[in-house]
Amino acid sequence: LDGRTPVELAQPKEDYPEIKGLVGHPAGLFVAPTERRNGLAWLLQRLVRALSIIRWSDMGWQCGTTRGPLVERGIPTNTYGYPNCDLLVDGWFEPSGLTEQAFMTSIDREEMLLQIADDLLLIEMNADKQVGDIVRTARQRHGHAPVLPAMAA
């Protein structure tokens, strides 16, 4: 620990989107190494998102926390489906007990609804395929963003 308090290690408030109202947090997601690369993390995030909207119909945001190495690999956007990934801590990160970068991931309600509609359509169009194949198609289709802007029109 370098002597700074958690508040001193946090990034300035103005660096984050205006998140307010009912905010969902899906907690931690750990997929065993033997189960990775088959689409499970992609599917679980979307399932939690859809169930959260059903349970809490006024939920305006979903936020999470992701560590630097996963951000470097694009996991928050191309797997977890978060369009926003903002630096949260650059230094001592208490949950891991390490000096590292941690990021706040976020998606607002409109983005969640568009993502759910888009992903359901993709699953329906590829009903004969395995989830891992659908995820690869989704990543190609979305690039780095989880939502197709054209669906907003």
Give a label for each model feature.
Residues 141-153:
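Long, low-complexity, intrinsically disordered segments
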